[in-house]
Amino acid sequence: MSVKEKIPAFNTQEDLESYISLNAYTKVYGDFKMDLHAVEAYIQEHVKPKTKVFHSTKERLDFLVKNDYYDENIINMYSFEQFEEITRKAYAYRFRYANFMGAFKFYNAYALKTFDGKWYLENYEDRVVMNVLFLANGNYNKALKLLKQIITNRFQPATPTFLNAGRKKRGEFVSCYLLRIEDNMESIGRAITTTLQLSKRDGGVALLLTNIRESGAPIKKIENQSSGIIPIMKLLEDSFSYANQLGQRQGAGAVYLHAHHPDVMQFLDTKRENADEKIRIKSLSLGLVIPDITFTLAKNNEEMALFSPYDVYEEYGKPLSDISVTEMYYELLANQRIKKTFINARKFFQTVAELHFESGYPYILFDDTVNRRNAHPNRIVMSNLCSEIVQPSTPSEFHHDLAFKKVGNDISCNLGSLNIAKAMESGPEFSELVKLAIESLDLVSRVSNLETAPSIQKGNSENHALGLGAMNLHGFLATNQIYYNSPEAIDFTNIFFYTVAYHAFKASSELALEKGKFKNFENTKFADGSYFDKYIKVEPDFWTPKTERVKALFQKYQVEIPTRENWKELALNIQKNGLANSHLLAIAPTGSISYLSSCTPSLQPVVSPVEVRKEGRLGRIYVPAYQLNKDSYPFYKDGAYELGPEPIINIAAAAQQHVDQAISLTLFMTDKATTRDLNKAYIYAFKKGCSSIYYVRVRQEVLEDSEDHTIQMQQCEACVI
């Protein structure tokens, strides 16, 4: 019987492509191998008929350069013979999509097309070639090494890089931006202008509202004049809607507010389902910055004071964001010159939980947790759209015409991810893999043009901050027959990221010999060595596998675990030579690139062994988990909702010990969960040392024949790499 003869009878539409029907077998009949037939049918029926044919590599390259598809500056770094050889080697790897979703995602979102959208101009191998040419920056031998890492799915650049590398008409290579807004009209106006510029260049932008004076605060000493933060949120939401990135999608933005800002309850109310249209915020993401003191007050069932940012600045000469509310809480409380209002701390957390059930927002950044880990002198005051970027920033000052009086430091980050399963399979090449990944992200930071946002350009040029992450943890665990909620899973996560951290710091230290140190290195905990005490001032066996299973896995894959002596030597080298990058690791959600790589997202468990996605006109697409078969199925059977928040938090906490930034941590709750259950999850994540909480996803009760169980939320495609 042929593949097409196996199409199930329930697909009766005459124009329905066979690959849709074949993919449906994955869910309807549990025949996971049929998804590979769907890939084959998709390539034959859809891709090949729409792919422009060239008779030689030279003809193709000449066409793409002449017609402004490829950037000749990238092409000209190499001889034609080198380009031809890299292309030949790329195709020699005989890359195959592991599932239908991976093929669909590539051709729908990444492949270069003619300007009229009618013809494909690239296969996966061609896109990888353009990435390695760009990331190797003219170094032919390095391009060949990178080719191996990317085309075997060991390392995956973030969407903005993978999509835009080598293109003549492109967006930026940078995934996300973070901007401070200070308490004056010039800063507000400049932030909106910068937001428009960054959003149209495909970036997701997060902005800080903590320092804006509250509603009713004085203006020019006249009381009850300020409108507070809500009108600014409305302006920002309209700006993101207008800058719709060449019509492809609406711009993505988030705003962060400190929990002790007087407008915090109105801030949360903007996401209420029944909010008045005058204040309702539909597409802007919300984030809360919550310090330790808030949890203490809630534990003691006390009132929490909300402090006027206007008065704090007048009294201390510092914005509210730049002080530790936990350390200064009782001083601020006693200061009669600081206006304050009060709400019940437990009521505050109950409201946060209610909003999570209604909308999935707000994100949560644990203020004191991230600042205790901060190796740098200035405070971390916010995060990004996916809550994995945590870096210090400093304010800018402006003239009345919005020109800069003083350029502060704002934040960008260059992202990419290791595929944990493939990285482990790299064995003795593990260190080279991490080194090449760090060098690739560093290159992106050095070639990105961020002149439209001078404060971000300054932050990037001084810090070259990176965010190397990881994905496919559940995939690796399941294929090695380890349950996600087992001690072995936590043990593996701990040792894996311990090993990645060592090689990442080593790579950046070696880069510093070539590129120089990041600007303020001498004032950091890296320079005095104290950051590395956790690896050095411990017993020799402290950072070693605690289970025989994990010890055996590292031996099986021949991945060497760094020793305490390795760290001692590295710490001394870093003190001597410095680091090229202020930040190295951050674990993003990896939505798109996980589908592209046919692997499980980030460190999260799968929602189910076969995920159901809704993709435009195609309708439902069924996505089997990484290497799903009868052997791995039991280890995928309990998905994120069945597992609940505790195992996910345990995994994130294990990794967070070694990640110098944060981890996009999504909590999954069933429809039976209560606000009390959510509050327990916040407290557990807080106590375990997690840096942040991303979305809260709630599986709702739905009609029996519906498969859309989860609250759908707008996500930043630039950030959910």
Swiss-Prot record:
It catalyses: a 2'-deoxyribonucleoside 5'-diphosphate + [thioredoxin]-disulfide + H2O = a ribonucleoside 5'-diphosphate + [thioredoxin]-dithiol. InterPro entries: NrdE_NrdA_C, RNR_1b_NrdE, RNR_lg_C, RNR_lsu_N, RNR_N, RNR_R1-su_N, Rrm1. The record marks 716, 719 as: Interacts with thioredoxin/glutaredoxin. One of its GO terms (molecular function) is ATP binding. Pfam families: Ribonuc_red_lgC, Ribonuc_red_lgN, RNR_N. GO terms for biological process: deoxyribonucleotide biosynthetic process. The record marks 183, 213 as: Allosteric effector binding. Gene3D superfamilies: 1.10.1650.20, 3.20.70.20. The active site is at residues 384, 386, 388. It is an enzyme of class 1 (oxidoreductase). Keywords: Allosteric enzyme, ATP-binding, Deoxyribonucleotide synthesis, Disulfide bond, Nucleotide-binding, Oxidoreductase. The record marks 176, 413 as: Important for hydrogen atom transfer. Its EC number is 1.17.4.1. Substrate binds at residues 159, 175-176, 204, 384-388, 589-593. GO terms for cellular component: ribonucleoside-diphosphate reductase complex. Under complex allosteric control mediated by deoxynucleoside triphosphates and ATP binding. The type of nucleotide bound at the specificity site determines substrate preference. It seems probable that ATP makes the enzyme reduce CDP and UDP, dGTP favors ADP reduction and dTTP favors GDP reduction. SUPFAM superfamilies: PFL-like glycyl radical enzymes, R1 subunit of ribonucleotide reductase, N-terminal domain. Disulfide bonds join 176-413. Belongs to the ribonucleoside diphosphate reductase large chain family. Provides the precursors necessary for DNA synthesis. Catalyzes the biosynthesis of deoxyribonucleotides from the corresponding ribonucleotides. Tetramer of two alpha and two beta subunits. This is Ribonucleoside-diphosphate reductase subunit alpha. It comes from Mycoplasma pneumoniae (strain ATCC 29342 / M129 / Subtype 1) (Mycoplasmoides pneumoniae).
